[in-house]
UniProtKB/Swiss-Prot annotation:
InterPro entries: Ribosomal_bL12, Ribosomal_bL12_C, Ribosomal_bL12_C/ClpS-like, Ribosomal_bL12_oligo, Ribosomal_bL12_oligo_N_sf. This is Large ribosomal subunit protein bL12. Forms part of the ribosomal stalk which helps the ribosome interact with GTP-bound translation factors. Is thus essential for accurate translation. It comes from Prochlorococcus marinus (strain SARG / CCMP1375 / SS120). PANTHER family: 39S RIBOSOMAL PROTEIN L12, LARGE RIBOSOMAL SUBUNIT PROTEIN BL12M.
Amino acid sequence: MSKKTDEILDSLKSLSLLEASELVKQIEEAFGVSAAASAGVVMAAPGAATGGGEAAAEEKTEFDVVLESFDASAKIKVLKEVRNATGLGLGDAKAMVEAAPKTIKEGASKEDAEALKKAIEAVGGKVTLK
């Protein structure tokens, strides 16, 4: 790769999850594209190749963990669990929790997603797996 692309890649690696999300939104606005539409097309292609029926019968292996809501009295405890799960700093994790409903972890294994769901629900949060 060129020096310029290496520098861009290094900059992207240093972004927090919240900063990466903001970057995606800015790119979508600047170029008139949608990251969600592209992902949907990519995800639809494997199902079409297998005939569709088999894909529906397979068990889902990756889950998105979504914080739906939380008890106001449990906000700090929920915030701590989100920080532990995401590795975000205090400010970024606080912004994520306050933006509920919000996806806090994407592509988690079934075991990791269930463990995170139990941990957050144990301290007063409401979580769904998608």
